UniProtKB/Swiss-Prot annotation:
EC number: 4.3.2.1
One annotated GO biological process: arginine biosynthetic process via ornithine
Name recorded for this polypeptide: Argininosuccinate lyase
Entries under Gene3D superfamilies matching the protein: Fumarase/aspartase (C-terminal domain) (1.10.40.30), Fumarase/aspartase (Central domain) (1.20.200.10), Fumarase/aspartase (N-terminal domain) (1.10.275.10)
GO cellular component assignments: cytosol
Keyword Cell membrane among record annotations: no
Pfam families (alphabetical): ASL_C2, Lyase_1
Pathway participation: Amino-acid biosynthesis; L-arginine biosynthesis; L-arginine from L-ornithine and carbamoyl phosphate: step 3/3
InterPro entries attached to this UniProt entry: Arg_succ_lyase_C, Argininosuccinate_lyase, Fumarase/histidase_N, Fumarate_lyase_CS, Fumarate_lyase_fam, Fumarate_lyase_N, L-Aspartase-like
Main location per the UniProt record: cytoplasm
GO MF, one annotated term: argininosuccinate lyase activity
Length: 461
């Protein structure tokens, strides 16, 4: 016989197509562990409220642990009528312990039950993603530590701008992913509000002490203060999906840089064979597919966020079945990022850096700002210095030479006070060393930041 949690007032069975449309067990089965944890806690609250006796409580806990073990070892068998994970667990529990299982749902609705499940699950995946991000930060940091003084072109508008160090580039992404971790952990704080005991929407009238539930479910440190909001709130899912989407954006930016830098036109980096693929037609090809997939999959992370927000935007209080659509976007974003972050960390850790190609891409024009700064040091107002260096750039272009090759006579024609010492500006290492302000690209500053991050990340296990 089918086991459903509702149906007494219905005079005909659910249509087959409606069941396929409505049932969610095939995807919410991954909530089994948190659903059972919530049910064990609920059984404890029922015992304290005198709604079940010691024997019934022991049977419920024993049965729930058996169901948990079946899910863990893969022996759980779904049955007809397993509409969702809650129904499946209760059905199997009754098979194992008999009618005592019928008391488990006393005073509880699937509305507060699933809200609790989703909070527990989302806390878990946020912590997992935080760990994955840390691994990626460590991979970037290791590269930065090896290249604190490796000079490369820095870009604005994808045009060569000023020299920077490769270590500084790596640490830029360490900073990005640190903000992502901060967002996840900030979201976790708001997830730790317990809705269990809110009932379907109006609260519980059977004397269940909700405070006891926060002791039994130690992931939660406060109770929801309004039962209507408790069962209809999915802000925490939206927050995590936003965090995932922004992680995806940052991964996409990292991937785009690596794709460019690994191309023959740049040649700054080379991905390991293990994180590249080939062509079915062109034997010479080595494609950066790991990075291209990271870039491409960021789109689905953005889509999952928009999908949930679109579901939520028109819902009246309180629970509506639309909210079933919160799960698949969340699950998909987690699965995508959990694997994607592992790939990103490994690809970064194993890529080869080509300092000689970076050095070959440097050109004197990138030191035009240094030239203007030197004029400022000699008392020329910056706007005037900027204009004068612009004139020198134009003279060099007209002559078909670099700024370093431009004759001193041209420099003195633009700024009479200049002498041969102006050519000292044309030193890439000198240029980056002078960018010694806090957060700058100077090798000493990069080494300081590497040490700070090494200490921070190793103490963050």
């Amino acid at each position: 016989m089918e086991h459903r949690l509702w149906g007494g007032r219905f005079s005909e069975p659910t249509a087959a197509e409606m069941r396929r449309f409505n049932d969610s067990f095939h995807f919410d089965v991954r909530l089994a562990e948190v659903d059972i944890a919530g049910s064990i806690a609920w059984a404890g609250a029922l015992l304290q409220a005198g709604l079940i006796n010691e024997t019934e409580h022991a049977d419920l806990v024993r049965g729930l642990e058996l169901v948990r073990a079946e899910f863990a070892n893969g022996s759980f068998v779904a049955a007809a009528g397993d509409e969702d994970i809650h129904t499946a667990v209760e059905r199997r529990l009754r098979e194992l312990i008999g009618d005592a299982a019928l008391k488990l749902h006393t005073g509880r609705s699937r509305n507060d039950q699933v809200a609790t499940d989703m909070r527990l699950y989302t806390i878990g995946i946020a912590r997992q993603l935080d760990r994955r991000l840390r691994d990626l930060q460590l991979a970037l940091l290791a590269q930065a530590e090896q290249h604190t003084a490796t000079v490369m072109p820095g870009y604005t508008h994808l045009q060569r701008a000023q020299p920077i160090t490769f270590g500084h580039w790596c640490l830029a992404y360490v900073e990005m992913f640190a903000r992502d971790r901060s967002r996840l952990n900030d979201a976790i704080r708001r997830m730790r509000v317990l809705p269990l005991g809110a009932g379907a929407l109006a609260g519980n009238s059977l004397g269940v002490e909700r405070e006891r539930l926060t002791e039994l479910l130690d992931e939660f440190d406060e109770l929801s203060a309004n039962s209507l909001d408790a069962v209809s709130d999915r802000d925490f899912v939206a927050e995590v999906l936003f965090a995932c989407a922004l992680i995806g954006v940052h991964l996409s930016r990292l991937a785009e840089d690596v794709i460019l830098y690994a191309s023959a036109e740049f040649g700054f980096l080379e991905l390991a064979d293990a994180y590249s693929t080939g062509s079915s037609l062109m034997p010479q090809k080595k494609n950066p597919d790991s990075m291209e997939l990271l870039r491409g999959k960021s789109g689905r992370l953005l889509g999952n966020l928009v999908a949930l927000l679109t579901v939520l935007k028109g819902l009246p209080l309180t629970y509506n079945k639309d909210m079933q659509e919160d799960k698949e976007p969340l699950f998909d974003s987690f699965d995508t990022l959990d694997l994607g972050l592992q790939v990103a960390a490994a690809a970064i850790a194993t890529m080869t850096v080509r300092p000689e190609r970076m050095a070959a891409a440097l050109d004197d024009a990138m030191l035009a700002t240094d030239l203007a700064d030197e004029l400022v040091r000699r008392g020329v107002p910056f706007r005037v210095a900027h204009s004068k260096v612009g004139q020198l750039v134009q003279r060099a272009l007209t002559r078909g030479v670099s700024l370093r090759q431009l004759p001193l006579a041209d420099y003195q024609a633009v700024e009479p006070s200049l002498d041969a010492s102006i050519y000292d500006v044309f030193d890439m290492q000198r240029s980056v060393a002078q960018k010694a302000s806090y957060g700058g690209t100077a090798p000493q500053r990069v080494r300081e930041q590497c040490a700070r991050w090494r200490d921070s990340l190793l103490n963050d296990e």
